[in-house]
Design a protein with these regions (language model features):
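Sec-dependent signal peptide recognition
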Residues: 1-7
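Mature catalytic domains of secreted/periplasmic carbohydrate-active enzymes
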Residues: 19-487
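Hydrophobic h-region of N-terminal signal peptides that target proteins for export
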Residues: 8-17
Length: 487
């Protein structure tokens, strides 16, 4: 028994290094898998911008910034500064902190949020944990300016983490406070210029003290909730390398102790891509990126394009969002959709309607999205072979799963209209599906809600000619999916 115990003690450091035991060094951290398979399978997530900025509900979620722009740039964001003084009062009388008591979140229900996310087809979900404004949405011991002590007086992150995970989804939290110190410079004479508000308006703190608080907050989110995904906004170049290394090693070690495969997302070049996951805000590559990536995309549209709730929001349609999801997934990405709840914690009905319809499409045709991987090309413009075919062709995107290739049409080719899919050649199919020899088509199926339809095909070196059957009804007014099974 003593021999076994000694052997176990000798091997313990090696076991620790094999799983966990990350050091705050890039070489050690490079053992971390930046994008685990669960994320590549999940494809679609939802999060929210919800915070104090939803009280004024004007301009966008950066109201905190624009209300303080009292110089020549005071007209920024639809006259944000001038409007603030007209509606709420001058900055020497009314500061951003005065919105906090109005941010009550009295109708917030974490279970209702999680239900909405799940019904919309999300496989990971969460919310902003802290935006640029310095207000933490969890129960923090490092700042009095947090949702558990002020405003809602609830641990929003803790409640939502439990609700999301109880429904089998992965939990997401985003941190945007890396530029809180430099974002706004409050001036003497303003209501904000008071030491008691220093931890809200970071610029009033000593810089080293503020950096320590930045790391403490990040580590606190990890220790209390250990999200499956932590998203960092831009400006991580403002954080010293040592602190970034300290955070990553702490997070990865905590996750390993819980048996979780976690992700850190970043923008630009703020982290190495072999350790973290690259995020494109409102954008995506136009061809397949060999490394998985994230696209965060907000539901709002038009003049505001706000991430947080504002009065008079214009919205993208469910068709816009589904088409973006299809485009992103076909290029080896995953889509993160942002919603914008009101200050009371409820979602406007028009936002709920949009994501409900996203969910209808995903619950019906999600097999072409979830768990798929890129085909050899993401997209082509298929050409009809009849005189009345659409002159500029039909947009079709590709995904694949095992020996199945999905063609997702965002333009409906119609019935009995032969369409050439030039990228579906035997060589491309064999490469994509890892098949030896010349593949044969086993079945071609137009997916529909009530019944599926068998399609006619001709499969040759020039591609695959697809003809939808005469009796096929238009399966969806958003996008149609044809599944090709090969053998």
């Amino acid at each position: 028994m003593r021999i076994y115990l000694i052997a176990a003690l000798i091997l313990l450091p090696f076991a620790s290094h094999a799983k966990g035991g990350y050091k705050p060094e890039w070489k050690s951290l490079s053992r971390h898998v930046p994008v685990p398979e669960w994320m590549r399978d999940a494809k679609f997530g939802i999060y929210c911008h919800w915070g104090v900025y939803t009280v004024p509900a004007y301009g966008n979620e950066q109201y905190y910034y624009y209300m303080h722009r009292d110089s020549a740039s005071a007209d920024f964001l639809m006259g944000g500064h001038r409007r603030h003084e007209a509606v709420w009062g001058p900055l020497d009388k009314f500061g951003y902190h005065d919105f906090i008591p109005m941010f009550k979140g009295e109708r917030f229900d974490a279970d209702e949020w999680a239900e909405l996310f799940q019904e919309s087809g999300a496989r990971f979900a969460g919310t902003v944990a802290e935006h640029h404004d310095g207000f933490s949405m969890w129960d923090s011991r490092h700042t009095p300016f947090c949702a558990a002590k002020m405003g809602p007086k609830r641990d929003i992150i803790g409640s939502l983490a439990n609700a999301v995970r109880s429904r089998g989804m992965k939990f997401f939290a985003s941190l945007h406070h890396e530029n809180n110190y430099t974002y706004v410079k409050v001036k003497p004479g303003w209501a904000a210029y008071n030491p008691k508000y220093a931890k809200l308006y970071g610029c009033l703190m000593d810089h080293d003290e503020w950096l320590g608080m930045w790391l403490d907050k990040c580590n606190e989110v990890v220790d209390k909730y250990c999200p499956d995904i932590i998203y960092f906004d831009a400006w991580m170049d403002l954080i010293p390398e040592k602190l970034k290394l300290d955070f990553l090693s702490h997070y990865f070690n905590k996750a390993d102790s819980l048996g979780r495969e976690v992700i850190v997302t970043y923008k630009y070049e703020d982290f190495p891509r072999n350790i973290c996951m690259l995020d494109h805000e409102m954008a995506n590559p136009d061809k397949i990126d060999p490394e998985p990536w994230l696209c965060d995309y907000t539901i709002s549209a038009g003049y505001h394009r706000s991430w947080g709730y504002v009065k008079g929001m214009q919205l993208s349609t469910h068709k816009d969002i589904i088409h973006k999801l299809i485009e992103v997934v076909s290029n080896n990405g995953q889509l993160l959709l942002n919603l914008s709840p009101r200050s009371d914690g409820t979602f406007p009905q028009d936002q709920k309607d949009v994501v409900a319809n996203v969910g209808v499409w995903l619950w019906s045709y999600g097999e072409s999205i979830y768990g798929t991987r890129p085909y050899v090309t993401s997209k082509e413009v298929a050409r009809g072979k009849t005189a009345d075919a659409k002159a500029d062709g039909y947009n079709v995107y590709y995904t694949k799963k095992g020996k199945t290739v999905y063609a997702i049409f965002t333009d409906y080719p119609g019935r009995e209209n032969p369409v050439l899919l030039a990228q579906l050649t035997p060589a491309n199919v064999a490469e994509a599906c890892g098949m030896k020899g010349r593949p044969r088509i086993k079945a071609a199926t137009l997916l529909s809600v009530k019944r599926n339809y068998t399609c006619d095909t001709t499969f040759g070196d020039d591609g695959l000619v697809l003809t939808l059957p005469r009796n096929a009804r238009l399966p969806s007014d958003v996008a149609q999916v044809v599944r090709f099974d090969f053998e």
